[in-house]
Amino acid sequence: MELRKEMPLLARHEGQWVGVYTTVDAEGRIIDQHKSHLTCEFSNDSKFPYKQTNRYMWSDGRTEEHFFPASYANKKIWFENERISGAAWEVDSDTVFLTWKRNDIANSKLVEMIQLSSDGLRRSRTWHWFVNDALVKRTLIEETKVV
């Protein structure tokens, strides 16, 4: 199985992405904003053919880095690690959809849409955060491919 062939849109996301994450509360007020640098890569590892590293940088000097290896089955990539559990799949030729839970937030569900530009150099992402089935915040992400 060649993941790039099975999920051609996901393959177009391979590379380095820089951007800004803006999180708003349920009423639309900005509650967080930070820069990001994501690495999306494919490998010959049969257990985890997709790997993603997210690096976050805040203006006050804080940083975070998270590694997300993903398995593949049934036309979806599956994340299962200490931080998240969930899956991503292609909806059409330019939209990827994800649902997952944050393992450190009880009764959480996140729903994400990733929209890739036709030239493959920009993407817009939105996360809807639910806790106990109630919307608690949204994260809006704008990114540019740099490599």
Task: Map each language-model feature to its residues.
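General beta-strand recognition
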Residues: 18, 49, 97, 122-124
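Amphipathic/hydrophobic helical signal segments and adjacent flexible N-terminal regions
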Residues: 1-65, 131-147
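Alpha-helical interaction segments
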Residues: 6-8, 68, 79, 117-119
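Central antiparallel beta-sheet cores of small beta-barrel/beta-sandwich binding domains
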Residues: 31-111
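Generic preference for well-ordered secondary structure
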Residues: 1, 24, 94, 98, ...
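Glycine-rich, aromatic-bearing surface loops/beta-hairpins
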Residues: 100-101, 106-147
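Surface-exposed coil/turn segments at beta-strand junctions on protein surfaces, enriched
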Residues: 10-12, 91, 118
